[in-house]
UniProtKB/Swiss-Prot annotation:
Subunit (UniProt): Homodimer.
CDD domains on file: SIS_PGI_1, SIS_PGI_2
PANTHER family named in the record: GLUCOSE-6-PHOSPHATE ISOMERASE (PTHR11469:SF1)
Active site, UniProt feature: E368 (proton donor), H399, K521
Any one GO MF annotation of this record: glucose-6-phosphate isomerase activity
Lineage start: Eukaryota, Fungi, Dikarya, Ascomycota, Saccharomycotina
Protein name: Glucose-6-phosphate isomerase
Domain of life: Eukaryota
Length: 555
């Protein structure tokens, strides 16, 4: 049962005075605001609407918001909306360990996981900092043993491969981060198994040797159906290859879990169990023990730097006024487009191959957090909430869906991300400069477009002219990073976490539960029993019955 909502004094964002003001501003100027004119009439627009974040190590990230459909008055009204929605109060309650996840009566305290300053952080009167630090120290010792070769498998050989078995937040984060930080990889290869489709596990097991493989079973409860099924199958494979001796399991399996009983029952030595608390949501768990595969891959010192980068954004988010608060501005712009321009999507395009899984990671972060239709006031929202987030790395994306972004009928607010310095500056930075030129050109093209006169001046005539016109005035945020390092990746993730938080706070929804994933799981268990029977299934609707029966006939 949902606890009494004490975190907002409004039921619907649409009831707030600033919401009505923004609707008025949209009609008056927002829907006709010309970015080309805005730049022509204000030479300081770039300086005025861009912000530079300084990371803990002195590296910088530039956030250019100037190509967005706003002016001073609109930004002022958005800031007022944040004040009326008590965004900063809710933020402070989150950082103070209060139970802002009202439907599950839990704190939302992933920020405590990157508290490398080790300042006291309390949940229910208990300082959790020592406990967080103890888990990190355990991760450090374990990862250094494995990476150095001191940890031996059952035949005395060192570990060469790590297989992380998890799903959702126990998979997406580590997959994305290990891909993004591949440049920092050490001696170990990492593999990830998430899908219950047996192909995922089978293909992974073809690549590893049981004598030199360490399996990480990532499930907080150690009861997640897909993960435990995959882990059990991996264990059976391991035993079948190693003389069926259960004593060998302890050298080749570790658990990222809090369920000591089930972990021990599985055969894992509980000394090799890494826990995390109920106040860590799955999609925010890469900072926790779930990040062990990352620490094994890039080394603990780099993993800690990753945490410190996120911590630096937390510091900025909690101490900077609304008008200069980078994640808050990002979230407010998202609300502006979603609710006043009727934008249904949010495009994120990393101009960086290492970040190729970043959009998929952000999909879960954004859509599982804010894909809600009921507010914290326990009423249905009468406005649009979570955006459909999508993206692919560029320049590949330019050759697939950018046609729709440039000339389609929808408003698609877009974030473009580029690292100025490549880890692979081949051909004297030729590739990097080509990549960067596309990063700058795409944002410029989306803004300036190409009118009929320009098309005709280029020689087009007749019916071809309208096909070559670009309307322009399409909003983008450009994020320019000095280099993709552990600290800067941590900062980018934390930026999007707090953007997501800001959106949810404005919409007055609980961004930290995920009841929408439950119903399908329940029905899957029921249908699983149907699939074990030989007779015809008749207990569902005609479509589901028909599909099940055809599957059984073909199985």
């Amino acid at each position: 049962m949902a606890t009494t909502n004490t975190f907002s004094d409004f039921k619907l964002a649409s009831e707030l005075p600033a919401w009505a003001k923004l609707q008025e501003l949209y009609e008056k100027k927002g829907k006709t605001l010309s970015l080309k004119e805005a730049f022509a009439t204000d030479e300081q627009r770039f300086q005025k609407y861009s912000r530079t974040f300084s990371n803990h190590d002195g590296s910088k990230i530039l956030f250019d918001f100037s190509k967005n459909l706003v002016d001073d008055e609109i930004l002022g009204a958005l800031a007022q909306l944040a004040r009326e929605a008590n965004v900063t109060q809710l933020r402070d309650q989150m950082f103070n360990g209060e139970h802002i996840n009202s439907t599950e009566d839990r704190a939302v305290y992933h920020v405590a996981l990157r508290n490398r300053a080790n300042k006291p952080m309390y949940v229910d009167g208990k300082n959790v900092a020592p406990e967080v630090d103890a888990v990190l120290q355990h991760m450090k010792e374990f990862s250094e043993q494995v990476r150095s070769g001191a940890w031996k498998g059952y035949t005395g050989k060192s570990i060469k491969d790590v297989v992380n078995i998890g799903i959702g937040g126990s998979d997406l984060g580590p997959v994305m981060v290990t891909e993004a930080l591949k440049h920092y990889a050490g001696p170990l290869k990492v593999h990830f198994v998430s899908n219950i489709d047996g192909t995922h596990l089978a293909e992974t097991l073809k690549e590893v040797d049981p004598e030199t493989t360490l399996f990480l079973v990532a499930s907080k409860t150690f009861t997640t159906a897909e993960t435990i099924t995959n882990a059990t199958s991996a264990k059976n494979w391991f035993l079948s290859k190693t003389g069926n001796n259960p004593a060998h399991i302890s050298k080749h399996f570790a658990a990222l879990s809090t369920n000591e009983t089930e972990v021990a029952k599985f055969g894992i030595d509980t000394k090799n169990m890494f826990g995390f608390e109920s106040w860590v949501g799955g999609r925010y768990s890469v900072w926790s023990a779930i990040g062990l595969s990352v620490a094994l891959y890039i080394g603990f010192d780099q993993f800690e730097d990753f945490l410190k980068g996120a911590e630096a954004v937390d510091k900025h988010f909690t101490s900077t006024p609304i008008e200069d608060n980078i994640p808050l501005l990002g979230g407010l712009l998202s609300v502006w487009y979603n609710n006043f321009f009727d934008a249904q999507t949010h495009l994120v395009v990393p101009f960086d191959q290492y970040l190729h899984r970043f959009p998929a990671y952000l999909q879960q972060l954004s859509m599982e957090s804010n894909g809600k239709s009921v507010t914290r006031g326990n009423v249905f929202a009468n406005y649009s909430t979570g955006s459909i987030l999508f993206g692919e790395p560029a320049t590949n994306a330019q050759h697939s869906f950018f046609q729709l972004v440039h000339q389609g009928t929808k408003v698609i607010p877009s974030d473009f991300i580029l690292a100025a310095q490549s880890h692979n500056p081949i051909e004297n930075n030729l590739h990097q400069k080509m990549l960067a030129s596309n990063f700058f050109a795409q944002a410029e093209a989306l803004m300036v477009g190409k009118d009929e006169a320009q098309v005709k001046a280029e020689g087009a005539t007749g019916g071809l002219v309208p096909h070559k016109v670009f309307s322009g005035n399409r909003p983008t945020t450009s994020i320019l990073v000095q280099k993709i390092t552990p600290a800067n990746l941590g900062a980018l993730i934390a930026y999007y976490e707090h953007v997501t938080f800001t959106e949810g706070a404005i919409w007055n929804i609980n961004s930290f539960d995920q009841w929408g994933v439950e119903l399908g799981k329940v029905l899957a268990k029921v249908i699983g029993k149907d699939l074990d029977t030989t007779g015809e299934t008749t207990s569902h609707d005609a479509s589901t019955n028909g599909l099940i029966n055809q599957f059984k006939a073909w199985l």
